[in-house]
Amino acid sequence: MARALPIRVVVVTMYESALETGNHFGEFRLWVERLPLNERIPFPYGFRDLRYNSEKSVIGIVSGVGTARAAASIMALGMDPRFDFTRAYWLVAGIAGVNPLEASIGPAAWVEWVVDADLAFEIDAREIPAEWSTGYWPLGKTRPYEQPVEADGAGWVYRLDPGLVTWTHWLTADLRLDDPPALREARSRYSTSRRLRRRPLCCAATRLAARPSGTALF
């Protein structure tokens, strides 16, 4: 049996609309083009073939949209005997929305806490009680922000390595991100938000995941 490839970094993305051609970009194509991930590895049990950079020992995967596809794809990758993930770092790279009162368009946010927001209740905004600030609350509770908080998050709250997240944020805090004319024009429409008018930057956030539209909370 051939020796398993030692992997240093796994880049996990959810979707890509046009990996090979076209002007539409999802979450994976720029990784393929710019890192680059220039080798294709067949991955019959996954959503799409894998991409690999042998010099950097970096592998990239498109997991597919939704919890079921993501779980199946990552399980298939983790159990694939062709790869050794013993010392690998996992970078989950996704697109999320952001409150325009908190950050500009196009930031890169490093996340310490990940919350699975599928496991929750939500009611029609027209029926939210007047004293509530939101109509969204977790399973096992009867109202938003009800105490006490579950000690272990009941399996839907995950904390990533805080030291690694802090180090990564420090390392990229002064990184100058792209700020093309189209992006500047888009944020100029938000004239009342001082933070949104700033150029994009690297920041820290919490990820609310697995909703129809992911959200980064600052």
Predicted segments with their positions:
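Accessory terminal and edge-of-domain segments that mediate assembly/interaction
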Residues: 1-218
